[in-house]
Amino acid sequence: MEEYKTDAEIYAVLEREIIDLTLRPGSSLSENPLCARFGAPRSMIRVVLQRLQENGLVKIVPYKGTTVTRLNREIVDELIYERTAVEARVLRDFSPKCTPEQRALIRRRADAYAALARAEEIDYNKLYEADRLLHETWFAAMGKMYLWRTLQNAHADYSRFRMLDTMTSGGLDEVIADHQNIIAAIERCDLAAFEPLVCLLYTSPSPRDTERSR
């Protein structure tokens, strides 16, 4: 049994498990097993489930139970549109100002992602975080961390989509290649290249993702 003192702590655990797909879309969440798992009273679990529903992560159906929500592909597509536009602009601003030290940091982070992606047993949580860290580099360099955090926290469906993207077998070599193409564009200061490259990175695996989110 896991010991948690507050509903906020229990919420944080379940939110993370939904976003990292430990709890898949359509999975059932029952009050009794959650009470036993967290050593919490039913009233506290109900507060947690209600908050998860308010944030679009679960759906509570009276007398039937609670399930993890399916991905809303329309919302995901809009968030990808937003992410592509913002990140391409940040890259255009960053590229002419990129220092040798920043280029070296980007290379190290891209190499770290590639090493995780090519491991015999892939840790998808670490891989997802390595990808986030790489993209965070140019936002941080341009002093756009508020924008970065806003994009990361925009909607749970987007975070789940990105995790599903990361876990899509056969797609990691393409992601590594996309990273290298973005880095090459930074190094040659090819400002026109960023929007199509970022668009390709975020939209290319969609058919398999759509199937797996149903």
Summary of predicted features, one role per range:
Residues 5, 104, 170-173:
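Short helix-capping and inter-helix turn/linker motifs at the boundaries of alpha-helical repeat units
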Residues 100-164, 175-188, 193-201:
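Conserved amphipathic alpha-helical segments that form helical-bundle/coiled-coil interaction surfaces
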Residues 98-99, 170:
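Short coil/turn segments
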Residues 1-96:
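Short linear motifs at protein or domain termini
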